[in-house]
């Protein structure tokens, strides 16, 4: 399982992670608490992570870059076309990952 891209939806208390492999097959779908973020991404091999640009995204982008990941901040209007159905954290993380930044 080689994750090439991760979409990360950040919220106040929980974060939704969606990762795909080189064949665009979902290989990671997980919800993390704020306290688990650093430990989880520290164990993960360096990869490309997309975040929706918002107030807290710059903090998390800096932290993830320190851990060796490549982070891309995406404006919300670039992600909206990739949302296939209703709105929740899981769907948003999948849409961020699907934006193919």
Identify what each model region corresponds to:
Residues 1-101:
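Phosphate- and other anionic-substrate recognition elements at nucleic-acid/protein interfaces
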